[in-house]
Amino acid sequence: MTADNALYIPPYKADDQDVVVELNNRFGAEAFTAQPTRTGMPVLWVERARLFEILTFLRNVPKPYSMLYDLHGVDERLRTNRRGLPGADFTVFYHLLSIERNSDVMIKVALSESDLSVPTITSIWPNANWYEREVWDMFGIDFPGHPHLSRIMMPPTWEGHPLRKDFPARATEFDPYSLTLAKQQLEEEAARFRPEDWGMKRSGANEDYMFLNLGPNHPSAHGAFRIILQLDGEEIVDCVPDIGYHHRGAEKMAERQSWHSFIPYTDRIDYLGGVMNNLPYVLSVEKLAGIKVPEKVDVIRIMMAEFFRITSHLLFLGTYIQDVGAMTPVFFTFTDRQKAYTVIEAITGFRLHPAWYRIGGVAHDLPRGWEKLVKDFVDWLPKRLDEYTKAALQNSILKGRTIGVAAYNTKEALEWGVTGAGLRSTGCDFDLRKARPYSGYENFEFEVPLAANGDAYDRCMVRVEEMRQSIKIIDQCMRNMPEGPYKADHPLTTPPPKERTLQHIETLITHFLQVSWGPVMPANESFQMIEATKGINSYYLTSDGGTMSYRTRIRTPSYPHLQQIPSVIKGSMVADLIAYLGSIDFVMADVDR
């Protein structure tokens, strides 16, 4: 598929009910229980016995739901606001996305604590593999028929399932930790790779295979990431990605932080994305609260998000070129990032992790003189990108190392849940800023960069062009910044506007309670996805009518991107794997959360 014959993507229509009509016609309306939410999509509960055939139908329906966007679970046992919903101790939900419809649907199945099992759907969507492993790891829900149901985030020796409500959320609730020599040896043995466990043979007809650990401390692994390679010489026969070394329990943390105090934690998901991480979270919370932010807030948020798209892509560009052997450009890209951080720091007060967006607005207004800082950067960067393109990206060695390497097409990308530049490099014109505009992106003029071959070179070139488009967006923000407040005038805006606290005791009380205890969000569910630096990032929030989230599901783009690796790299050389890893653009914090 090329940019010329890319799929037609219709205008986005929230809560599109067409699929509900199709499902009712095929299975009968009695097969579904509709749940009203603020997720912007139909949410349907089904019986476990009919789950597989319903999902199969959605996978094969005309204009199919080609992507399993997300799959995870909820411990419902302590949830009090469940009126009208099927009885459940646990829930497994399936979030499906159709590019051709430009719409989503969520299917839920209720489970009792005494029978925690649901059939695997790895035969329908291959990327269900890791998601089902994570649900088993976090909740203890079984998936009969899964090819290798094992821990994925937690160590193999871990006891318990962390996202259950009865599992401790704080280290102080555990006994003091000690690592004896015997336990250390046990952990090392548990991490030993056994090919037979993964259906691999130690030898072929005429050769013995070598098994090589790449990582978890290899410079080309881009973080604490391990890939076990089955090699015939330098050819990769098969491989097994091993993740979880960077897992910090971000979703568990969200259950014990207020809606307001969780904002800094979002910065640490994709730690190169800065305020881009804040955006889907605060937008989702604002849906729960019913907050509509002023136009100025939207424009400020877009401008700063695009600044972080540029800083993230500059780091990608330098490390990508370094991965294929050129050592100098990475020093230039890091230096150039500092110019962006000078602007970011002047506006937000921080550099990498500003935690600057707020529920209902941003932390403070733009400082005096911000326009000159932004204009200087906007005028300067395009010439630098021209230099990178001429000096490095047109280099014959780099092109020889990356053109035609680790290529996949649109169909394969959708099956594995690939989004962002990885999807658009195949010719699929799907960018949420255009396909499903949020925060006012529909008011800006910019192009969606596309390529055709879906290889390691195209993925890089798409990101370079994305930086040019980000500059265009930032320039429009600078020239058209509206007047007005930087926070919404709403009771759940957190913190409330400071000025009134000096005049009204009621506002002062609200300010104190919302900052210390957190705002009380109405019981409901909300969802927001955005076009983040590495692909589509989203927050699916469940409120039980309290000051903290009942369940926070963070779907990151890098997680499915790493799961796809074996399907793309088999039959290639180890050197090609290094180029492929560099072209994915991932950080392990985004994968492991």
UniProtKB/Swiss-Prot annotation:
It is an enzyme of class 7 (translocase). This is NADH-quinone oxidoreductase subunit C/D. Keywords: Cell inner membrane, Cell membrane, Membrane, Multifunctional enzyme, NAD, Quinone, Translocase, Transport, Ubiquinone. Residues 208-593 are annotated as: NADH dehydrogenase I subunit D. Its EC number is 7.1.1.-. It comes from Pseudomonas syringae pv. syringae (strain B728a). Gene3D superfamilies: Cytochrome-c3 Hydrogenase, chain B (1.10.645.10), NADH:ubiquinone oxidoreductase, 30kDa subunit (3.30.460.80). It catalyses: a quinone + NADH + 5 H(+)(in) = a quinol + NAD(+) + 4 H(+)(out). It holds the Pfam family Complex1_30kDa. It comes from the Bacteria. The gene is nuoC. In the N-terminal section; belongs to the complex I 30 kDa subunit family.
